């Protein structure tokens, strides 16, 4: 039997934990109304005597709220819902919110309504009520091809049963486990010190580094090239020039990364330096963890382990199941 590896611990002073793809935290609005001029959208509540039945059979999102419906599709979406209710005999309709619902408020609603999650522009978010008075240990079980599972422990009570809780969709190969209030202080892109790094790697990295005068970063065989601690606008302008070079037909093959000194940069530095690809930083008075999936992107089932009284003991994410 594989031995669990301790990845670290998170704290959750608000008592409400958020789990999602950590690479998408750039979209998190906290207590603010989501504001995306490029992708305007509307949020709806399903109302009426048959609201829950209509939500279940319509099956577009979990619960009786429908978030982030693109503005250009609102009329068609509403007509589709109305037709669905007529066909199924449901007494329900859509009521648009005056403005989009802040992501922090979506967490509050999901926890209070005992809904398993919600979406942020199509990205699954799983919130859950957890103990606020102690650190929550995060462990992982190793397997042949990566982690078999990860587990966030709420108590040391024996597990009597396990329920399907939801599913995490990941496009950036990383999970985040974070206090819902603390995420309102998260800076995903804005540099905290006004600086940024610009890193090059790949097949033709030496050629590109020579062209742009990028120094080596270290002295190992797999060394990368680039600049660290540049003023943000200088790093940005160099990045634009390098991107232009990369996009030239028949040009060199390489990759590069623009890394502003944000909270995301801080925690990913710890992740890259960690044997187990997990890191914890404090933001907004809480310890937040970023942990790589170990298997890249995908959809990962999440289970809720409970004790004999049905009280949650832990959340468990299935990662690389081995048959």
Describe each model-derived feature in a short phrase:
Residues 112-113, 124-127, 264-267, 276-281, ...:
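Short linear motifs at secondary-structure transitions and domain/linker junctions
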Residues 272-322:
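C-terminal structured interaction module
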Residues 2-264, 271:
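Extended, low-hydrophobicity segments enriched in charged/polar residues
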């Amino acid at each position: 039997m594989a031995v669990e590896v301790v990845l670290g611990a998170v704290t959750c002073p608000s008592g409400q934990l958020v789990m999602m793809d950590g690479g998408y935290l750039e979209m998190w609005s906290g207590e603010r109304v989501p504001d995306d001029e490029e992708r305007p959208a509307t949020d709806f509540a399903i109302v009426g005597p048959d609201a829950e039945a209509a939500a279940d059979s319509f099956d577009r999102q979990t619960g009786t709220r429908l978030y982030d419906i693109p503005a250009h599709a609102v009329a068609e979406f509403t007509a589709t819902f109305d037709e669905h209710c007529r066909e199924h005999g449901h007494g329900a309709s859509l009521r648009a919110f005056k403005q989009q619902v802040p992501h922090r408020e979506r967490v509050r609603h999901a926890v209070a309504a005992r809904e398993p999650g919600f979406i942020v522009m199509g990205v699954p978010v799983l919130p859950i009520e957890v103990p606020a008075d102690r650190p929550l240990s995060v462990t992982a079980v190793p397997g042949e091809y990566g982690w078999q599972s990860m587990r966030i422990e709420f108590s040391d009570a024996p597990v009597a049963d396990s329920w399907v809780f939801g599913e995490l969709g990941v496009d950036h190969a990383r999970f985040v486990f974070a206090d819902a209030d603390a995420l309102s202080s998260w800076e995903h892109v804005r540099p905290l010190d006004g600086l940024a790094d610009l890193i090059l790697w790949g097949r033709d990295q030496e050629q590109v580094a020579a062209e742009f005068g990028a120094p080596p970063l270290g002295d190992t065989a797999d060394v990368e090239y680039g600049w660290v601690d540049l003023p943000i606008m200088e790093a940005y302008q160099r990045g634009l020039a390098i991107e232009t070079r990369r996009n030239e037909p028949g040009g060199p093959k390489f990759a590069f990364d623009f890394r502003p000194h944000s909270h995301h940069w801080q925690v990913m530095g710890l992740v890259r330096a960690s044997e187990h690809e997990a890191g914890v930083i404090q933001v907004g008075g809480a310890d937040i963890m970023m942990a790589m999936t170990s298997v890249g992107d995908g959809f990962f089932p999440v289970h809720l382990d409970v004790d004999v009284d049905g009280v949650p003991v832990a959340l468990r994410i299935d990662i690389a199941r081995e048959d």
